[in-house]
C-alpha cells in the first residue's frame, strides 16, 4: 500500500504528529542521531520491527553550518546552509509521519473489539485520554513544523535573490555562478523579501536603445523563408539599420545586395528582376547577386558595384552574414523534429526592439495573464512556475507546463508544446503528451525600434490540416492576435525603458532564460573571450 493510500485511511483527527521517542546515537551519513525505537507508555517496543519505521527512517542531519573562509558567506556556502535546513525539515516531516503511524496503531489496538473484552470501561477511558493528550502534543508539533517550513521558505526566497544578484554581478561568465543559479529553488514566498533592503542590481536595461554593437553582426541570420522568394520576386529587409534586398540570380541561388541604386539612391526593390538581375525602376541599371552592375541603358558602361552580403539557402530558409569574415562552419538545422509537418510560415514587421521581443518570447509565466483570449484561455494560474535548465545551458523546460524551450543565438527561440487537453497544459511533461506543437521564432534586429519576426509552426498530428483551403489565413490571423496581446505590453515597456525605466529591475526564478539571454548578449557586446552558457553561443555557430 502506498503512503498516500495509507494516509487516506487514517481518521482526520489523527493527522497531527507527535510521539515520545527513545533514541541512541548511531552512525549516520551526517553523524547525527538515528531513531531506533518508539516506546509506548508501558515501555513496549512499537517501532523496532515496525514496517513504518523502516519506511520513514532517516538520519537526523543535525544543525550544521559550513565554515566561512572570509568575512561573509559566499553564495555556495549560503546555499549549503539552506540545504541543511531543508534536510532537517525533511527529517522532521518523516518523524511526524512516523508518529501518525504509531498513533494509528494505538487507536486500532484500543478500539479492537477483542481487546475491549478484557478491559474495563475505566481502562479504556484512561487509554483514550492518554491518546488525546498525545494528539494535543502532535497538534503543537504540527504548528512547530509549519513554522520551520515557513522559515525555510523565507531563506529560500532570500537565497534566490542572493543568487540572482551574484549572477548579475558576475555577468554570467563564471561557471560556478551559473551552477548556483540552477540550484536556487523558486518559491511563492519571494514576495516576502520586498520589505528587506533590495540588493544592488547590475543588469540594467534602461534608457534609449543604443546603436548595435558590431559584434552582434558576426552571426548567420535567417531573414526569409524560401517559399516567399520566387524567381521573379524581391524581398526587402532591414538589418541592423541598413536596407537590403534579396532576390534569386540566374542560377536560382539567392543573393543579398544593398537596397540602394549606385546611380541616384533609388530603392531597388521598387523595380523588378530581369534574367537573374535586379533592375532599378529609375533608369534601368541592373545588378547581379554579388552587387556588380551589369547593365546601364542609354550610357557608357562603367565599373560600378553596390555592397552585397554573403547569402545562402538551407532547409527552406535564406540566411545572410551582416558582419565581417563569415566562418566556414555549417549552420545548425532549424527544421522541426522528425515526424512534424510545417503548417505555417509567417513574417511580420513589429515596432519593438528585438531584445524586448526576445525577452517576451523567453517568458511563459505571463501567458495566463496576457493571452486570456487566445492560446492560454482557461489556463489556471500555478502557485509556482519554474524554468528548469542545466547550469550552463540556454535550453530547458517549464514546470508545470509541458513546454520545452531553447534560446539559440543570435536571435532564435525554439519551443515544443505538449498538447494533452484543449485549454489545459498542466500535469504532464512534454514527452508524456502524445501530440505536440513546435514553434520557431526568429527576431531579426531591423533597427533599434523595429524587428522582423519570422514564425514557423509545425504539428506532429493531423497533417491533412495543411491542405484545408485558406488555412494559412486562419493561422496568420491567430498568430497576429497572439502577438497583439504581447505588443500592447512590450510597446509600453519600450516607451518606459526609453524614458529611463529598467525592464529587468527585479528578476525572479522564472526569468532564468531571459536573464541568460541578456547575459549572453552583454558578453557578446563586451567582446569577452569565453561566452557564457555552453558552446552553442560561439560566434557564427
From Swiss-Prot:
Coiled-coil residue windows: 114-151
SUPFAM superfamilies: Bet v1-like, ISP domain
Enzyme Commission number: 1.14.13.122
GO molecular function: 2 iron, 2 sulfur cluster binding; chlorophyllide a oxygenase activity; iron ion binding; oxidoreductase activity
Cross-referenced InterPro entries: Cholesterol_7-desaturase, PaO, Rieske_2Fe-2S, Rieske_2Fe-2S_sf, Ring-hydroxy_dOase_2Fe2S_BS
Reaction(s) the record says it catalyses: chlorophyllide a + 2 NADPH + 2 O2 + 2 H(+) = chlorophyllide b + 2 NADP(+) + 3 H2O
Region: Disordered, residue numbers: 178-208
Residues involved in Fe cation binding: 359, 363, 366, 371
GO biological process, one term: chlorophyll biosynthetic process
Tissue: Expressed in leaves and germinating seedlings, but not in sheaths and roots.
Record keywords: 2Fe-2S, Chlorophyll biosynthesis, Chloroplast, Coiled coil, Iron, Iron-sulfur, Membrane, Metal-binding, NADP, Oxidoreductase, Plastid, Thylakoid, Transit peptide
Biased composition (Polar residues): 178-192
Any one GO cellular component localisation term in the record: chloroplast membrane
Xref: PROSITE patterns: RIESKE (PS51296)
Occurrences of domain Rieske (ranges): 220-320
Main location: plastid
Signals that turn on the gene: Down-regulated by treatment with H(2)O(2).
Functional note: Catalyzes a two-step oxygenase reaction involved in the synthesis of chlorophyll b. Acts specifically on the non-esterified chlorophyllide a and not on chlorophyll a.
Domain notes: Consists of three domains A, B and C. The C-terminal C domain possesses catalytic function while the N-terminal A domain confers protein instability in response to chlorophyll b accumulation.
Protein name: Chlorophyllide a oxygenase, chloroplastic
Organism annotation: Oryza sativa subsp. japonica
Amino acid at each position: 500500500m502506498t503512503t498516500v493510500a495509507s494516509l487516506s485511511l487514517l481518521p482526520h483527527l489523527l493527522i497531527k504528529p507527535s510521539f515520545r521517542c527513545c533514541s541512541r546515537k548511531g552512525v549516520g551519513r551526517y553523524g547525527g542521531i538515528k531513531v531506533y525505537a518508539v516506546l509506548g507508555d508501558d515501555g513496549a517496543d512499537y517501532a523496532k520491527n515496525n514496517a513504518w519505521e523502516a519506511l520513514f527512517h532517516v538520519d537526523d542531519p543535525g544543525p550544521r553550518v559550513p565554515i566561512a573562509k572570509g568575512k561573509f558567506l559566499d553564495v555556495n556556502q549560503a546555499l549549503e546552509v539552506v540545504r541543511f535546513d531543508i534536510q532537517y525539515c525533511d527529517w522532521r516531516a518523516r518523524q511526524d509521519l512516523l508518529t501518525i503511524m504509531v498513533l494509528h496503531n494505538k487507536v486500532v489496538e484500543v478500539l479492537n473489539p477483542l481487546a475491549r473484552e478484557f478491559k474495563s470501561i475505566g481502562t479504556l477511558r484512561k487509554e483514550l485520554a492518554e491518546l488525546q493528550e498525545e494528539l494535543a502534543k502532535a497538534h503543537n508539533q504540527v504548528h512547530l513544523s509549519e513554522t520551520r517550513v515557513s522559515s525555510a521558505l523565507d531563506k529560500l526566497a532570500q537565497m534566490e535573490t542572493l543568487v540572482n544578484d551574484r549572477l548579475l554581478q558576475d555577468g554570467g561568465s563564471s561557471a560556478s555562478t551559473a551552477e548556483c543559479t540552477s540550484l536556487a529553488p523558486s518559491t511563492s514566498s519571494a514576495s516576502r523579501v520586498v520589505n528587506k533592503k533590495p540588493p544592488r542590481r547590475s543588469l540594467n536595461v534602461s534608457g534609449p536603445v543604443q546603436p548595435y554593437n558590431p559584434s552582434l553582426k558576426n552571426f548567420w541570420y535567417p531573414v526569409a523563408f524560401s517559399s516567399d522568394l520566387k524567381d521573379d520576386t524581391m524581398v526587402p529587409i532591414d538589418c541592423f539599420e541598413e536596407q537590403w534586398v534579396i532576390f534569386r540570380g540566374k542560377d536560382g541561388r539567392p543573393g543579398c545586395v544593398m537596397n540602394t541604386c549606385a546611380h541616384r539612391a533609388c530603392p531597388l526593390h521598387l523595380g523588378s528582376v530581369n534574367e537573374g538581375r535586379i533592375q532599378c525602376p529609375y533608369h534601368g541599371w541592373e545588378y547581379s547577386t554579388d552587387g556588380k552592375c551589369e547593365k546601364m541603358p542609354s550610357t557608357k558602361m562603367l565599373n560600378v558595384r553596390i555592397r552585397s552580403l554573403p547569402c545562402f539557402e538551407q532547409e527552406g530558409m535564406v540566411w545572410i552574414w551582416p558582419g565581417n569574415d563569415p566562418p566556414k562552419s555549417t549552420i545548425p538545422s532549424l527544421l522541426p523534429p522528425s515526424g512534424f509537418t510545417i503548417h505555417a510560415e509567417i513574417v511580420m514587421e513589429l515596432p519593438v526592439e528585438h531584445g524586448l521581443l526576445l525577452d517576451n518570447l523567453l517568458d511563459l509565466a505571463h501567458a495566463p495573464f496576457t493571452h486570456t483570449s487566445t492560446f492560454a484561455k482557461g489556463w489556471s494560474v500555478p502557485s509556482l512556475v519554474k524554468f528548469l535548465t542545466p547550469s550552463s545551458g540556454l535550453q530547458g523546460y517549464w514546470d508545470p507546463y509541458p513546454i520545452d524551450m531553447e534560446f539559440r543565438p543570435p536571435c532564435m527561440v525554439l519551443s515544443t508544446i505538449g498538447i494533452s487537453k484543449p485549454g489545459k497544459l498542466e500535469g504532464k511533461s512534454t514527452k508524456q503528451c502524445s501530440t505536440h506543437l513546435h514553434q520557431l521564432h526568429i527576431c531579426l534586429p531591423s533597427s533599434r525600434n523595429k524587428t522582423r519576426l519570422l514564425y514557423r509552426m509545425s504539428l506532429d498530428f493531423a497533417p491533412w490540416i495543411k491542405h484545408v483551403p485558406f488555412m494559412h489565413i486562419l493561422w496568420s490571423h491567430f498568430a497576429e492576435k497572439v502577438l497583439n496581446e504581447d505588443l500592447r505590453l512590450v510597446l509600453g515597456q519600450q516607451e518606459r525603458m526609453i524614458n529611463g525605466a529598467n525592464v529587468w529591475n527585479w528578476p525572479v526564478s522564472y526569468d532564468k532564460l531571459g536573464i541568460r539571454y541578456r547575459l549572453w548578449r552583454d558578453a557578446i557586446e563586451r567582446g569577452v573571450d569565453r561566452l557564457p552558457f555552453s558552446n552553442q553561443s560561439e560566434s557564427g555557430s
